[in-house]
Amino acid sequence: MTKNLLVELGLEELPAYVVTPSEKQLGEKMAAFLGENRLSYESIQTFSTPRRLAVRVLGLADQQTDLTEDFKGPSKKIALDADGNFSKAAQGFVRGKGLTVDDIEFREVKGEEYVYVTKHEAGKSAKEVLAGIPEVLASLTFPVSMHWANNSFEYIRPVHTLIVLLGDEALELDFLGIKSGRVSRGHRFLGHEVEITNADSYEEDLRTVYVIADSKERENMIREQIKAIEAEQGVQVQIEEGLLNEVLNLVEYPTTFMGGFDTKYLDVPEDVLVTSMETHQRYFVVRDLDGRLKPNFISVRNGNAEHLENVVRGNEKVLVARLEDGEFFWREDQKLKIEDLVAKLANVTFHEKIGSLSEHMARAGVIAASLAEKAGLTAEEKAAVARAAEIYKFDLLTGMVGEFDELQGIMGEKYALLAGEDEAVATAIREHYLPDSADGALPETKVGAILALADKLDTLLSFFSVGLIPSGSNDPYALRRATQGIVRILDAFGWHIPMDELIDSLYGLSFDSLSYDNQAEVIRFIKARVDKMMGSTPKDIKEAVLSGSNFVVADMLEAAEALSEAAKTDGYKAAVESLSRAFNLAEKADTSVAVDASLFENDQEKALAQVAESLELTGSASDKLAQLFVLSPVIDAFFDNTMVMADDVAVKNNRLALLSALVAKAKTVAAFNQLNTK
């Protein structure tokens, strides 16, 4: 016989960003709990609002499955003493399993007898097992937690109610001092306390007190209400999915409405208006059917449509205050001179251990010039890079960015264009912040990409130089994100700039403001980001590529992909083993010894020498692998007919030098001795 189980935890208002992950986590933790406790079920449903997390288990068995386990103990010769009685070892073994020596039997395993006992455990009732539900709730993890009242424990928010219903029976449990029952809380303003009749009536019981427990249903309500407004008003609403996910976790009973603002604010840049609406007010942007911004917005009320006109007016008033600020800053900022703002950056601290923003920009400018040369930019592009590097942080001192910091770079581009700066320079000012997330958009222009690289490289090197290095999950200065951006940009633009050589050249620069330090740590850190970009590539292939001599990001990622594909082919194992053998011996070579053909003693040496000298790895990574793998017979023949570690020291060193010459070329693809062929 099965029943449905409902568990609801009623809390104070949760942060919107916590709600969905917590709902998912509760479902996963409940599934794991039931699985570990051998309590079968058909399926699990989860629910959430800003003030509750809930899970319903459908078709829950009324009893655990019985458990029968065999346990292997000591060998018979250890289990019995000289008189044939059970030894202390045997007695201790069965006692540890809750059994007696009467339960012992001997079974033969690989020609020797061992003690075995079989333990039978009858399944407990579902009620007994479900007494562990408070442990499930306690196991939930949150990004933040708090204490309340005089309690010693902490949780995401204070807990007010707990419901555990097995069918229509309320189980008596306790979590953080809250005793379970069947009473839930309705909407904070429209509802009241409500008794949940049984596990199946949960959503409908809450609906009577203006709570929509199913987050997907709330989402659908919002979408449908927006569609109705679009049809009625002849507009289209810009639904940002991240904003929608946030909004639906701010409301328990959504009612969508449209408000408006004076058309005069449309003279303010669209980015300012959109940021004011989406980021600051959590409103959806409204456009006409041609995509032009309308003087309207969509918002979602946490409640019903009663007195909605008052809510509309209130929201309009709040937004207009924001737009007034935006209009004021837009007007006043245009009176400022870029050069004056740049000069003031000398008084703005980048970091107390590193110096000012001006000093950071000066170093980035030197790096940018070097990168522009290495990337083969035109003279015109180099000039744009140089100018952009001189001014690219100026907008941080504008009133608009001071009020709307999300617009840094974006406003810099607009103000630069108004001041007559070249379009390439203005675009680079915006693009140097990109990517602004792990998978965010990349710069589209070469000038912007070079400036982004330079800014991120100086940030990385500067923080490492003063010992501010990320550890564990702690990365307060977002250096992992910056480095991931460096790697992604280099890959996207296909610039063949070896990172080790680049970093080495940067450490050779001299600045009055700062001396770069911790070079080896920086290289390791960058390689870790390349490793991350390789995704699910097998670990040995990652290690082989990262241990190779080619630190061109695009080449490394291509090599990892090519090796992953090659590993599926028949000839991979033999070819890799041949190359690995060469790699392992080459490590013993004296790098100062040159290959001397007069010391060759057999045709196989000569053949390998000819191959090593003529080998020019060209084309794609797959092409290079093919060129290396075809050498496998030549390498094998060499090893079959040649004693590398010969007694004659000169001959031995010559053979090691020969292998080293071959390996040096192969290592530009990967360190093949790091690959696993088992």
Curated annotation (Swiss-Prot):
It is an enzyme of class 6 (ligase). It catalyses: tRNA(Gly) + glycine + ATP = glycyl-tRNA(Gly) + AMP + diphosphate. It holds the Pfam family tRNA_synt_2f. Its EC number is 6.1.1.14. Keywords: Aminoacyl-tRNA synthetase, ATP-binding, Cytoplasm, Ligase, Nucleotide-binding, Protein biosynthesis. Transmembrane segments: none annotated. One of its GO terms (biological process) is glycyl-tRNA aminoacylation. GO terms for molecular function: arginine-tRNA ligase activity; ATP binding; glycine-tRNA ligase activity. GO terms for cellular component: cytosol. InterPro entries: DALR_anticod-bd (IPR008909), Gly-tRNA-synth_bsu (IPR015944), Gly-tRNA-synth_heterodimer (IPR006194). It comes from the Bacteria. It is found in: Cytoplasm. Tetramer of two alpha and two beta subunits. Belongs to the class-II aminoacyl-tRNA synthetase family. This is Glycine--tRNA ligase beta subunit. The gene is glyS.
